[in-house]
């Protein structure tokens, strides 16, 4: 099975280890990974900031880059969601809307692909300790992926998963929201950190690097002792 990887901007620039873990997990599951070097940003930051035409140019480039893929997989629920929004963005342009739909139909978030397409619930990972899961807004509310991360983590040897209080609450990242509305964002992430600490977990695990960079940065500034990990890193663990 050929999988074309959309690595995302944040993974490419800040969390390359997440990209490596994503590839290694998928390869162990029998996937052949392709990486188009022409890939750029999915256009979400520009689109959400109101720069629609600039966003469309990036989106068109991404459609051209990925439309011939068999499966498109990304370690980000937020970026996967943006791919699924492409048909809506181009709804008044039938030519591009059709091409956008073709891309959207074969785009999956990393854990969604493992559980729903590969039909795998245990990847053979092991990580001793206690974890709690942060569920990102776009991934759960828009993409509809709510169960796959928990299913996979429940089968990680040695790992106990505890429910995160107020798990439905946003972490305060929201892309440019955290920059434009910093005081509100800080209050939101403080509440998220407090909830994570309440669980007594060793690890806070999520599927979006934006959320994890935001939460992890706040944890570090506050001097809290809980390790933030992307789920790809956890599933690639052999502790």
Swiss-Prot record:
Transmembrane segments: none annotated. Pfam families: CCG (PF02754). Belongs to the LutA/YkgE family. InterPro entries: Cys_rich_dom, LutA. GO terms for biological process: lactate metabolic process. This is Lactate utilization protein A 1. Is involved in L-lactate degradation and allows cells to grow with lactate as the sole carbon source. One of its GO terms (molecular function) is oxidoreductase activity. One of its GO terms (cellular component) is cytosol.
